Every structure is written in structure tokens, then in C-alpha cells.
């Protein structure tokens, strides 16, 4: 379990990574700039998803950024996420234990929820597809369950946020 002292060290490590690798676009205080959005209040889940998948958003939401290979390892990504989470509340990274999606009956339920909420953009097979105005929904093949869950709670790029009232946490796990 992480102690408050460990958490403080991780936040400071994240701040140092942020200042070196992120502040030129997001601002010294994560306030955002013309080229990149503010990060205050986006939460650790958003950072973990964006940095961990290489799907950084643009400040101008009418433009879709191309996916790039992630440049930070898991420890650095966790430190960045901890730093951004320390700035203001936002969606948290789901715990490994909460991502135990191997429940009885969850596969059928997840399939139905996927068809009703996700397939219109990501297509029936999860292969992704074209959207309007030159945007696209990425393939979900090979994406970690954690990142799919984080995308549902943070709404990256053109994707809507699926609040817990729209799709419950248990239903998100089924998807």
C-alpha cells in the first residue's frame, strides 16, 4: 500500500517529468495553451489513458491527433498521473482488483451494452471506423481493459464521457 510520503515522492517525480516533457504544450501549471488543453481536473485516468496509449488530444477538438507510440514507461506514466491528479479532482485510474471482469454472465451483458453504446462508432467487431469530419474511432483490438474503462470515464477526443448514471461501473466492466 502506498504511504502519504511515497505518494508525495511520486507526485514530485511526476511534476519533474511534466515540466520536462509536457509543460511546453500544456503550460507550466497545466493550464493549457493554444496547442494543448488544460489538464487541471482531467484526473489520473485521463493521463493514464492518453499517455499510456499514445492518444494525446488536441486543444482544438475539431482536429484529431494521430496515435503515437507511448514515450513513458508505466512508472513514469503513474507519476505523471499522480501529479495531474494532485492538481484537482478527476476520474481515478481503476484498481487492478476492480478490473476483474470475469464475472458470471458479464460477457453476454457486455456484448449487448457494446452493441447499444459503442458499435455505432467502433463497429460491431470493435475494429474502429470512420466518423464525420475526417475523424475516426480507433480499433479496440489489443487494447487493455483498463484503457477501455478509462476511455469510457474520460471521453477522449470525439468519444463521449459515459457517466455512471448512463453506464454503471459494473456495466463498464462488462463491456
List the model feature ranges, each with a label:
Residues 7-41, 49, 53-59, 86-94, ...:
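Periplasmic/extracellular electron-transfer cofactor-ligation site
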Residues 38-88, 125, 131-175:
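Extracytoplasmic electron-transfer domains, predominantly the class I c-type cytochrome c fold
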Residues 92-109:
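Solvent-exposed, charged amphipathic helical/linker segments at domain boundaries
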Residues 14, 72, 102, 106:
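Residue-level marker of regulatory loop/turn positions in helix-turn-helix DNA-binding domains and
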